[in-house]
Amino acid sequence: MSTQYETQGYTINNAGRRLVVDPITRIEGHMRCEVNINDQNVITNAVSCGTMFRGLEIILQGRDPRDAWAFVERICGVCTGVHALASVYAIEDAIGIKVPDNANIIRNIMLATLWCHDHLVHFYQLAGMDWIDVLDALKADPRKTSELAQSLSSWPKSSPGYFFDVQNRLKKFVEGGQLGIFRNGYWGHPQYKLPPEANLMGFAHYLEALDFQREIVKIHAVFGGKNPHPNWIVGGMPCAINIDESGAVGAVNMERLNLVQSIITRTADFINNVMIPDALAIGQFNKPWSEIGTGLSDKCVLSYGAFPDIANDFGEKSLLMPGGAVINGDFNNVLPVDLVDPQQVQEFVDHAWYRYPNDQVGRHPFDGITDPWYNPGDVKGSDTNIQQLNEQERYSWIKAPRWRGNAMEVGPLARTLIAYHKGDAATVESVDRMMSALNLPLSGIQSTLGRILCRAHEAQWAAGKLQYFFDKLMTNLKNGNLATASTEKWEPTTWPTECRGVGFTEAPRGALGHWAAIRDGKIDLYQCVVPTTWNASPRDPKGQIGAYEAALMGTQMAIPDQPLEILRTLHSFDPCLACSTHVLGDDGSELIAVQVR
């Protein structure tokens, strides 16, 4: 039975052909997407489904709050560290712990490192192949590719011989008949607009980024012991520092600090001379995508803010990445965000596979309930092999968070819009320069292409902040300030009998909040509302659709059986649905085939 209704400026109509893409690949975790298209192949209904259950909130109940970071960090191995950071923030807020300046600086270095790493991996390894036609690169003239690359930047790997070697490697790979990770690409699709030389350049940089991303994360290994899942501690950072030539075996020394400086320099060089020019090249040949995939970005966006410049101060003046919320498209009125206010952040479950005492009412995370209830309702297929979801009922393992009752978009585009409209000078200069280079209006950033450009902007911004915070750290160390942790309130005997706190930051993918309540030294309640919970949310009791669903609305597909347009827009958000489980069919086989119906 078809249904039609109006919400958030869109007309939802589930009549017409139904296309199912399951799973969405080149993301973190497991995701399914279903859309309806009309006779003109325009998407008139979109359904986003998270196909796995996390449950760490349940696991944490009754545990030592000082250990929470180590559990929640395992939510994700890609955006590694951000959940641990939000967790230690939350526990410190609850107990009243103040961290040393160096701990705050090192935490910011860890976060900025992740931003650079994650945005590079997303741009090249996860989203890049939506824009770069790998097979078309075989048609390129390496000499012309060299001329193109040298016209864009001074990156040294740009000779004709270099691109000839890369092309030859690709040719041998293709002639071997095993395309591997490139096997399921829609090569030759009419939406691929880059010329062969730009495709060869992009593919070469894809390989370089794949290699270089291993170097960036060594900063995590220096200060956190390893990557993924570096070590943290409630009260600071677990890394002693010794800048003398002897003593303090195992501490971070000048050799390690010099390595960090070297990596920061090389990271900025790669982003400035490879990633930024590549992003602009993609934009130059794909300008129509500045009007596709707008979704909620011109209506409702949210950022908590991040990178406190002053230790233990999360106020507006301290956060180098501004926070705020915009609703109803009023960008002249960026609203303050209060994560303790029960009327602001609320999660709904009436279309998710969870239960509340009253499913029609949202709950603030401090009153949050994680009660899984897998009940797909009236679907085509079986409970373990769903052929078509029923969006009128429950259809996702993701709750529906709302800010003051509004579905919101979070992530680089949301952050950039909020920082821009709050007058952040660096953001205004960077965005204006990008859009001017592409001869596009500012509104063009509110799009699928805009999300790609905003990640490039943020990578460059984060690389600059890496140097800023490293310089601050070195100044402290040279002045004899070596403290990296406070143990004043380490023992539970120093804690209140009951307390609660909230920790927030901005993960590469968007606004991240952890809420914790402690009773008698143990975790009594723990709730996480993560970026993809916001963006991939299902419908709520008012029928509002989430950011993914909204961004797909109105998209015209050139070849419905090759849903490149769907992948471009979904990948522009960099979905992260956590990677700890697999989805199995009735016979135990893993469901890995992409199906379009």
Name these PLM-found stretches.
Residues 2-597:
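Metal/cofactor-centered catalytic core regions of large enzymes
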